[in-house]
């Protein structure tokens, strides 16, 4: 069984790093936005490295899914840097980084009572698969405190009352704060309960309900990561206790910034194990980005400006994405040919537009 799973992962790796045309088209939009995200948040990364690093992110995501279903990996988890709190009830806050899908397994192995918070409703199949996996872990490690893993959606009626009930019963609340809006991790720009914070020298809007819950119910937050280094290691950071001497708004603002500062430090060490590069453009201040001035690079021969733009395909339609502003536009066949190096079919108006917008330089 173990060998079969390893073979499956190797197959996935091969498809990611040596994609066929169908795979390229499938990942086309994700690739484009990831390249733009690298340029915005990691400007020191060479443009020529964007595609390889995008594939590294996708492979890290694939490994996380593989790790979750490979129960044997739990046997060798390294807990030497994990310090759980003495309190029965607290919030374990993590990120979509590295081996994050192993955190629930860790709590089962450590015989802890916990529940998971997501944003959207979970499909029946996902619940069934998760429960089968839970039963395997429970039996393997003789967990005596859980019969199932309650999963709460923030969109459920009475969500906050369910959280209060479970915390009072002595459960740990497990939540992934970066992109906590469902299984795809996508957040809406300037949605409800969003805070503006600094992240890699850019302003982003993030969900801020987690610190408010800690403040209301007077429970600490324990930041935790699961990362790959000679195996899988679970590491905790200093706990954050609600400061009731300040307002809930001030505590929320300070805490959410602190949590993303922690995430940034983690990412700097190994940037491409964070899934957020696939969707962080959803959090950007687009109004601010739209005011960026276009590059004025000149060249004697017209070529596609791959530093500023990247093209992608969705449902057989061609688009171009501005990496600086994160705005995308549908383009016609002639423009796509020009991007590919064939400019003979362009009209004068199309050619002028491409030069004016620095798409061709």
Model regions: which residues?
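Membrane-anchoring hydrophobic helices of lipid-metabolizing enzymes
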Residues: 1-105, 113, 131-140
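Short internal beta-strands
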Residues: 115-122
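Short, charged, surface-exposed secondary-structure boundary motifs
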Residues: 124-130, 233
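Short, basic, glycine/proline-bearing loop/turn elements
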Residues: 141-151, 192-199
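Active-site glycine- and acidic-residue-rich loops that bind
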Residues: 148-160
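Non-catalytic C-terminal accessory region of glycerolipid acyltransferases
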Residues: 157-318, 348-356
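Low-complexity, glycine/alanine/valine/leucine- and proline-rich hydrophobic stretches
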Residues: 309-338
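Long, charge-rich, low-complexity alpha-helical segments
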Residues: 329-361
């Amino acid at each position: 069984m173990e060998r079969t799973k390893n073979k499956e992962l190797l197959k996935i790796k091969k498809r990611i790093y040596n994609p066929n045309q169908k795979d390229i088209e499938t990942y086309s939009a994700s690739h484009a936005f990831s390249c733009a995200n690298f340029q915005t948040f990691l400007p020191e990364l060479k443009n020529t490295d964007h595609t390889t690093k995008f594939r590294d992110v996708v492979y890290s995501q694939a490994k996380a899914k593989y790790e979750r279903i490979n129960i044997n990996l739990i046997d060798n988890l390294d807990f030497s840097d994990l310090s759980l709190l003495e309190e029965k009830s607290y919030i374990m806050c993590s990120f979509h980084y590295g081996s994050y899908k192993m955190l629930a397994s860790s709590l089962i192995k450590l015989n802890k009572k916990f529940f998971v918070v997501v944003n959207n409703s979970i499909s029946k199949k996902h619940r069934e698969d998760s429960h089968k996996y839970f039963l395997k872990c429970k039996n393997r490690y003789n967990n005596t405190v859980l019969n199932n893993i309650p999963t709460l959606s923030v969109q459920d009626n009475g969500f906050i009352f369910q959280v209060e009930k479970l915390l009072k019963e002595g459960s740990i609340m497990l939540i992934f704060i970066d992109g906590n809006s469902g299984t795809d991790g996508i957040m809406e720009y300037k949605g409800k309960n969003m805070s503006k914070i600094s992240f890699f020298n850019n302003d982003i809007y993030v969900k801020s309900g987690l610190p408010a819950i800690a403040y209301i119910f007077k429970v600490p937050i324990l930041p935790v990561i699961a990362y790959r280094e000679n195996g899988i290691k679970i590491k905790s950071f200093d706990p954050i206790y609600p400061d009731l001497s300040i307002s809930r708004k001030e505590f929320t603002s300070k805490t959410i910034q602190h949590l993303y500062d922690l995430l940034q430090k983690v990412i700097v060490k190994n940037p491409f194990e964070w899934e957020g590069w696939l969707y962080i453009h959803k959090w950007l201040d687009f109004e601010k980005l739209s005011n960026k001035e276009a590059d004025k690079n000149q060249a004697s021969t017209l070529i596609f400006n791959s530093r500023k733009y990247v093209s992608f395909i969705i449902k057989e339609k061609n688009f171009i994405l501005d990496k600086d502003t994160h705005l995308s536009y549908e383009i016609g066949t002639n423009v796509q040919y020009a991007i590919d190096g064939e400019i003979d079919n362009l009209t004068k108006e199309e050619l002028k537009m491409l030069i004016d917008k620095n798409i061709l330089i």
